[in-house]
C-alpha cells in the first residue's frame, strides 16, 4: 500500500479482503476505514481477565502433566500387626492385576501357617485360663505344636486342618478364643479363619482375595509396590514395624511425598510380642508422635489410618478402652464415643501445627480402601499443585 504522506502517482497495490484481491486501488481515506475501532474499557477488562484465566489454565495443565510424569513416594509406617501390609495387598488388587493362580497357590502356605498359629495360641491360652481340652484331642494338639515348632507349612497334612476344625467346636477351645486380649496374644483375624476352617481343609483349596487379605505375614524387610491411579504414578514403601526394624525407617525418609501411618484400633488391650508387657496402643501413639514431630517431615503430609474398625466395634462390646485409658469415662461399649476419645488421644501426640488427614478404615474391605485411597490421591495432587503456586 502506498504511503499516505507522499504525492507520488504510483498505483496502489491491490489489498487482501477476506482472501480475495480487490482489482481497484483505494484512496488513503477509504484504507483507514478498515482498521478496528478502539476497544471499549469494559471489553478490554474482559479481554485481560480472560487472558489471565487462560494463563492460569495453561499453568495448571503444565503442573498436572508434571505430576503425571513424576512418581509420588508414599512411606507406609506403623507398628507390628497394624494392617500395613494389608493396605499394600489392596493396592495390588485395586490398581495392579491382582493375584495370579500361581501366586494364590503360593499364598496357601501362609493361610495354613495362620491357622496353625491361631490354634497353637488358643491351646496355650487354655493353659493360661485353666481350661481343660479333652484327651481325645491330645493327638491333634501334639501335631499342631510340632508343626508350629518346625514351621513346615508348605505340605501340610489336610487331616491336621480337619482336626483343627473338630477342635474349634470344643467348649474350652471356644472359651479361650473368646477371652484372649490381655490374657494372651491371638491373631486379629482368628475368627475369620476359624469360622471357615472346613473350606481351608479341602484338597483343592485355592485362597480367595479375602483369604489373602486376612492372612497375616509379619513384615521383616522393606517392600516396594509401584502402581498408578488415574494416570498418577505411586511408589509405596512398606517398612517392617516391629521394634527391631524401626532403625531402618530413617533410610527411606528422603524425597517422601507423604507418610501413611497405620494404627490398629483394636490393640488397646494387647501387649507387644517383642517384650510381652508394653501396651500396643500406647506404643503406637508414641511411635506416631516420634514420626510426626520429626523436623524432616515438617512440610510432608501425614495421613493417618485408624484401622480395623470392624474388629474394634466388636471388641468394645466385651472390653472397653478404659482398660488402657482410665480417663475414659463414657459408656464402655459405645463405639462412637470410644472412637472419638481414641482419635483425640492419638492426635494429641502431634506437637506441631500441621494438619493430619485422618481416615477410619477396614483394610480388609476393598471398597473402603478404594474410596479412602481416592481421597488420599486427591489430597496429594492438591498439595503438589499448591506447592507449584496453583
Swiss-Prot record:
Molecular-function GO term, any one: GTP binding
Region listing for G3 motif, in residue ranges: 234-243
Ligand binding (GTP): 78-85, 213-219, 238-242, 307-310, 363
Region (G1 motif): 73-86
Region of interest: G2 motif: 211-219
Binding locations of Mg(2+): 85
CDD domains, A to Z: G-alpha (cd00066)
InterPro entries recorded: Gprotein_alpha_su, GproteinA_insert, P-loop_NTPase
A single Gene Ontology CC term: heterotrimeric G-protein complex
PROSITE patterns named in the record: G_ALPHA
Pfam families per UniProt: G-alpha
Domain of life: Eukaryota
Domain G-alpha: 70-390
Annotated GO biological process: adenylate cyclase-modulating G protein-coupled receptor signaling pathway; gamma-aminobutyric acid signaling pathway
Entries under Gene3D superfamilies matching the protein: GI Alpha 1, domain 2-like (1.10.400.10), P-loop containing nucleotide triphosphate hydrolases (3.40.50.300)
Region of interest (G4 motif), ranges: 303-310
Assembly and oligomerization: G proteins are composed of 3 units; alpha, beta and gamma. The alpha chain contains the guanine nucleotide binding site.
Family of this protein: Belongs to the G-alpha family.
Function: Guanine nucleotide-binding proteins (G proteins) are involved as modulators or transducers in various transmembrane signaling systems.
Name listed for the protein in its UniProt record: Guanine nucleotide-binding protein alpha-7 subunit
Gene that encodes the chain: gpaG
Amino acid at each position: 500500500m502506498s504511503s499516505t504522506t507522499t504525492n507520488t502517482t504510483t498505483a496502489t497495490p491491490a489489498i487482501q479482503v477476506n482472501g480475495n484481491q480487490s482489482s481497484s486501488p483505494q484512496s488513503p481515506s477509504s484504507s483507514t476505514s478498515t482498521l478496528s475501532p478502539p476497544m471499549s474499557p469494559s471489553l478490554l477488562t474482559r479481554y485481560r481477565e480472560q487472558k489471565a484465566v487462560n494463563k492460569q489454565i495453561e499453568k495448571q495443565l503444565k503442573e498436572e502433566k508434571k505430576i503425571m510424569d513424576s512418581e509420588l513416594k508414599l512411606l507406609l509406617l506403623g507398628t507390628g500387626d497394624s494392617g500395613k501390609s494389608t493396605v499394600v495387598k489392596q493396592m495390588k488388587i485395586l490398581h495392579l492385576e491382582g493375584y495370579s493362580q500361581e501366586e494364590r497357590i503360593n499364598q496357601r502356605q501362609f493361610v495354613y501357617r495362620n491357622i496353625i498359629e491361631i490354634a497353637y495360641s488358643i491351646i496355650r491360652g487354655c493353659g493360661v485360663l485353666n481350661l481343660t481340652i479333652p484327651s481325645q484331642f491330645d493327638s491333634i494338639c501334639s501335631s499342631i505344636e510340632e508343626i508350629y515348632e518346625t514351621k513346615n507349612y508348605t505340605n501340610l497334612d489336610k487331616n491336621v486342618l480337619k482336626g483343627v476344625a473338630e477342635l474349634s467346636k470344643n467348649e474350652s477351645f471356644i472359651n479361650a478364643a473368646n477371652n484372649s486380649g490381655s490374657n494372651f496374644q491371638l491373631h486379629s483375624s482368628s475368627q475369620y479363619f476359624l469360622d471357615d476352617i472346613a473350606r481351608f481343609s479341602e484338597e483343592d483349596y485355592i485362597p480367595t482375595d479375602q483369604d489373602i487379605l486376612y492372612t497375616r505375614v509379619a513384615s521383616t524387610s522393606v517392600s516396594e509396590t509401584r502402581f498408578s491411579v488415574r494416570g498418577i504414578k505411586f511408589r509405596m514403601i512398606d517398612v517392617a514395624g516391629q521394634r527391631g526394624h524401626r532403625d531402618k525407617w530413617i533410610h527411606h525418609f528422603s524425597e517422601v511425598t507423604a507418610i501413611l501411618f497405620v494404627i490398629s484400633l483394636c490393640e488397646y488391650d494387647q501387649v507387644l510380642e517383642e517384650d510381652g508387657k508394653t501396651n500396643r496402643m500406647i506404643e503406637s501413639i508414641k511411635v506416631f508422635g516420634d514420626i510426626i514431630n520429626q523436623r524432616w517431615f515438617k512440610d510432608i503430609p501425614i495421613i493417618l489410618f485408624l484401622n480395623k474398625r470392624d474388629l474394634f466395634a466388636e471388641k468394645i462390646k466385651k472390653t472397653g478402652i478404659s482398660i488402657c485409658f482410665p480417663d475414659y469415662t463414657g459408656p464402655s461399649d459405645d463405639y462412637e464415643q470410644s472412637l472419638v476419645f481414641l482419635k483425640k488421644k492419638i492426635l494429641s501426640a502431634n506437637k506441631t501445627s500441621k494438619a493430619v488427614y485422618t481416615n477410619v478404615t477396614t483394610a480388609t474391605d476393598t471398597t473402603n480402601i478404594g474410596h479412602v485411597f481416592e481421597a488420599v490421591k486427591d489430597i496429594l495432587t492438591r498439595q503438589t499443585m499448591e506447592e507449584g503456586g496453583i
